[in-house]
């Protein structure tokens, strides 16, 4: 499963990482930093810009299924997020068993949940 590596290679990698103190340069002039007052509080205004083309929605839509059945959890994103309604196994199960019309309790448990980000 795991291959043994030479300790010399590992020591060389560790030495290379040890030279990188802090992870990034704090001298970067292109990076914006929040200015703090004497109490340590900062304030910023975030402005949302319009999209480059008018066809894009200013938010993302995510459809998922999340439910507990037979003591086990099922939490997955639904392929209908991308318009593919046929490859989601839960949506297929709902359609095949016509849960909307036959078993509203189970349908309420397994139906798609839509969230907007």
Swiss-Prot record:
One of its GO terms (molecular function) is metal ion binding. Disulfide bonds: none annotated. Single-stranded DNA-binding protein that participates in viral DNA replication, recombination, and repair. Coats the lagging-strand ssDNA as the replication fork advances. Stimulates the activities of viral DNA polymerase and DnaB-like SF4 replicative helicase, probably via its interaction with the helicase assembly factor. Together with DnaB-like SF4 replicative helicase and the helicase assembly factor, promotes pairing of two homologous DNA molecules containing complementary single-stranded regions and mediates homologous DNA strand exchange. Also promotes the formation of joint molecules. Homodimer in the absence of DNA, monomer when binding DNA. Interacts with the DNA helicase assembly protein; a ternary complex between the helicase assembly protein, the single-stranded DNA-binding protein and ssDNA is an obligatory intermediate in the helicase loading mechanism. Part of the replicase complex that includes the DNA polymerase, the polymerase clamp, the clamp loader complex, the single-stranded DNA binding protein, the primase, the DnaB-like SF4 replicative helicase and the helicase assembly factor. Interacts (via C-terminus) with the viral SF1 dDA helicase. The acidic C-terminus is involved in modulating the ssDNA binding properties. The N-terminus LAST motif is involved in the cooperative binding of the protein to ssDNA. Belongs to the Tequatrovirus single-stranded DNA-binding protein family. This is Single-stranded DNA-binding protein. It comes from Enterobacteria phage RB70. The lineage of its organism: Viruses, Duplodnaviria, Heunggongvirae, Uroviricota, Caudoviricetes.
